[in-house]
Amino acid sequence: MALGFFCLAIFLYLSLDPDSGYTSASAAASGKEGVEITYGSAIKLMHEKTKFRLHSHDVPYGSGSGQQSVTGFPGVVDSNSYWIVKPVPGTTEKQGDAVKSGATIRLQHMKTRKWLHSHLHASPISGNLEVSCFGDDTNSDTGDHWKLIIEGSGKTWKQDQRVRLQHIDTSGYLHSHDKKYQRIAGGQQEVCGIREKKADNIWLAAEGVYLPLNESSK
């Protein structure tokens, strides 16, 4: 099992590092619609309205929690925009299983290993719910839990499918808008949580390495 995870880590590193010279078949094929998103896949989430990618880097907020900041990034080619889809602890889902509508999931930032997180701190620009990155491989709590809501009739999450992510603890939807930072993350836009359903909290899975679907999930 440990060897398998080590091999996966090497595969993801070679596939996703723009300086490595390698391109995975899964990443190259990810432009077609209908690819199943499975637990263990490393994906980019695109904000539907602005086309910015969900992004994080090792820069803390200067207000609120002071935790690692989360932003919307305008470019496509940036390894700080990859997130690994993980189940929550105590569930039966395993790597390669399909992600079902209504599932509670976690998103782990691939570069820093922290979890997409939210809480009641105010976001820096709009004063909505702050969204941050927090924890590590061995530290995670319910502040990292998000409910996947598929827009429409789909039962499992697929690439290019319109989805919302609702934070379990605060009920806020993962949200972004064209309000941009001027200093530390100049040109990047605010990501926050809001409790109202709006067009600005729709996301789509875009580029990534999509792990094959387990036979038991087909």
UniProtKB/Swiss-Prot annotation:
Q: Is Oxidoreductase a UniProt keyword of this protein?
A: no
Primary localisation category = endoplasmic reticulum
**Pfam families recorded:** MIR (PF02815)
* Location of this chain's protein in the cell: Endoplasmic reticulum
> Domain named MIR: which ranges?
34-88, 96-151, 154-208
Which InterPro entries did the record assign? MIR_dom_sf, MIR_motif
Q: Which UniProt keywords apply?
A: Endoplasmic reticulum, Glycoprotein, Plant defense, Repeat, Signal
Supply one GO CC term from the record.
vacuole
Q: Which residues are glycosylated?
A: N214
| Listed Gene3D superfamilies | 2.80.10.50
Q: Which GO terms describe its biological process?
A: defense response to bacterium; defense response to fungus; pattern recognition receptor signaling pathway
Explain what induces or represses this protein's expression. By tunicamycin.
Which SUPFAM superfamilies does the UniProt record give?
A: MIR domain
Q: What SMART domains would the database entry show?
A: MIR
In terms of CDD domains, this protein maps to: beta-trefoil_MIR_AtSDF2-like (cd23294)
Per the record, what phenotype accompanies loss of this gene's function?
No visible phenotype under normal growth conditions, but mutant plants are insensitive to seedling growth inhibition in response to the pathogen-associated molecular pattern (PAMP) elf18 and show increased susceptibility to phytopathogenic bacteria.
- Signal peptide position in this chain? 1-21
Q: Give the protein's biological function.
A: Involved in the endoplasmic reticulum (ER) protein quality control and unfolded protein response. May be involved in the quality control of glycoproteins. Forms a complex in the ER with ERDJ3B and MED37A/BIP1 which is required for the proper accumulation and function of the surface-exposed leucine-rich repeat receptor kinases EFR involved in pathogen-associated molecular pattern (PAMP) triggered immunity.
Q: How does it assemble?
A: Interacts with ERDJ3B.
Put simply, this protein is called Stromal cell-derived factor 2-like protein
Q: Which organism is it from?
A: Arabidopsis thaliana (Mouse-ear cress)
Gene behind this protein: SDF2
